[in-house]
Amino acid sequence: MLKKYIIITGSIAALMGIVVFINSQITDSVTQLPNPNIEQSDKINGQVPPNTPTKTMFESRLLTQDILDDRGEPTGWTIVTSRSVRDKGTRSPIHVHPHGGQTCVVSGEMSLYLDNEPDIQKAGPGECYWMPAGRRMSGVNSADSRTIMIDTFVVPKGDQVWIVVEPGMKDAQDQFDKLFHTHK
């Protein structure tokens, strides 16, 4: 069991080293403001995604856990997981993740609109999709009902999990900050 834990921890640490470099290209590490090179836009691949951009209806944090190295010492990284409910006919504001993450659908259906990706990724109950770091995206509720999903991110302790880049939607920025940005 300890060997498995060490392998998992080592793999996460290596991945996070790569993510740190990517993060430095997305946000200013002091202010956490979007890098001016990230386009502020209401479009993905030249088109406005379907549905109305909103905050989710409900968010609850399920897990906040510091990641430890093989000696049991904190690595400076934290895994955070939340459960959210998105109403039918809505979508997330266009945003960027400084560090990648995944969404797993419990009920309903989500469609990921991802910049520079012509195919829309759909996930139904029991399915997940990956949200890569540094790319503009929007999660669209493509079901005829509310959708319940679980989001998981591994981030440097105290970092944001997303940066809203859709004009007029800056008030949605604190949607996750209240859940995730308080894990300092």
State each model region's role:
Residues I94, L112-Y113, M131, R136-A143:
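Short beta-strand His + acidic residue motifs that chelate non-heme Fe in jelly-roll/DSBH
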Residues R83, Q102, D119-Q121:
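Short, surface-exposed secondary-structure edge patches
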